Amino acid sequence: MSEEVIIDIIKGDEPQAIKPQENLIIYGVNGKPITGRTPNQKKLVEAFAKNDLTFALGPAGSGKTYVAIALAVKALKNKEVKKIILSRPAVEAGEKLGFLPGDMKDKIDPYLQPLYDALQDMIPAVKLKEYMETNVIQIAPLAFMRGRTLSDAVIILDEAQNTTTHQIKMFLTRLGMNAKMIVTGDMTQIDLPASQTSGLVQAIGILKNVEGIARVEFNKKDIVRHKLVQRIVEAYEKHDEKVRKASMSKKHEQAEKKGEE
C-alpha cells in the first residue's frame, strides 16, 4: 500500500484514485485490500468492466454483492461516475413493509442493512455520512426507483430473485447515460408467493442473448464466509435434490396408475 493511501486512511479521508494492481478493487477503511478472491469473483470484475449490465447469481456468502459494491465504490472514487444507487426489493421471508413497525426509514433500514455494512467496510464513516446526506450514495427500496432515469451512476439491485416480473423490467429500464448496473440474486432463495414468477428468473431467460449484458454464475466454492456455511449449503443442496427426485418419482407413479385405469 502506498504512503499516500495510508495517510488518507489515518486522516479519515478517501484514498485517492486507485492505481491498477492485480486483483485489487479498492482498499477498505482498515487498509486491507479488497480483491476478487475466487475465480468467479474475478469474472464479475471483468464482466463489469466490459458490460453495462451484469447479472451475478449464486448462493449466500459467495461475495457477489460485496464485490459489486466494491466495484461501485471504486468507480466513484476514480470519478468514473457521480453516484452510487443501491436497492433491494422490500419483500423478504414473507414480510412486507406495511406490516413493519415505525416510520418509513425504520421500515426500510432492516432490508438495506447488508448494503450499509459493506459500505462501512469501504468508506470512512465521516465520508460515508457526507455521501449519504448529499445523495452521492443512495440506498432505497426498489419501489422508489419508479419514474427515474439513473445516469452517471453505478446501480446495484440486490436480492433480485424477490422482484416481480414488472418490478425488474421497471428497474432495468431506468438505465441512463454513463451508467452501469449489477443485478445480484440467489435462485434458491425466492421468497415470493408461490403464484408469482420471480422477475430475475424471467429476465435471465429473456435477456440471455442481448449484447452488452453479462451473466456470472457463483457456486459453493466461492463462499468466503465461515467454512461451515459451505457445508450448510451443500447439505441443503442434497436435501433439495432428494425432494426433487421424490417428487418426480411420485408424479411418474401417478402417471402409470392413470395409464392402467
Predicted ranges, named:
Residues 1-21:
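Interdomain "pre-motor" coupling segment immediately N-terminal to P-loop NTPase/helicase cores
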Residues 25-26:
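Polar/charged, Gly/Pro-rich intrinsically disordered segments
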Residues 29-157, 161-261:
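Conserved helicase motor core of SF1/SF2 NTP-dependent helicases
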